[in-house]
UniProtKB/Swiss-Prot annotation:
InterPro entries per the UniProt record, alphabetical: Histidine_triad_CS, Histidine_triad_HIT, HIT-like, HIT-like_sf
Official protein name in the record: Adenosine 5'-monophosphoramidase HINT2
Domain HIT: 55-163
Record-linked PROSITE patterns: HIT_1, HIT_2
Gene responsible for this protein: HINT2
Amino acid sequence: MAAAVVLAAGLCVARRAVAVAGPRGVQVRGAAGVTDGDEVAKAQQAAPGGAAPTIFSRILDRSLPADILYEDQQCLAFRDVAPQAPVHFLVIPKKPIPRISQAEEEDQQLLGHLLLVAKETAKAEGLGDGYRLVINDGKLGAQSVYHLHIHVLGGRQLQWPPG
């Protein structure tokens, strides 16, 4: 079953733009750089499994650059290349779990650790007034990369409902 898990609170921080090196050269994206439709289209085309490396596995093995905010033996936090808020970063496990719905009982400690890292990194990024955590799961949940990841969004007043 596909789902999107969303946890929310209020917020406020400075707006940012990100320069992204890609196949079309360097692009600069602001907080509204990608539309919901773009992400849904990506999710519809994303392969939910397979042997091909994901963009996140390539960031983990350092074959793709990332603006890393935090790293330990279990996870990595880095800025999103297409931010949807003034502050938008991802927290990913180093263990390749494709979807939250495929996490196992043995992943319980790791999943809790990801949330704590999200909280501490949000604090370090100045999101003391609040932020939102999002985990997309599966095609209908608009998951576009099949490596579990938590989006942390903040730096402005977020709206409800999100979808």
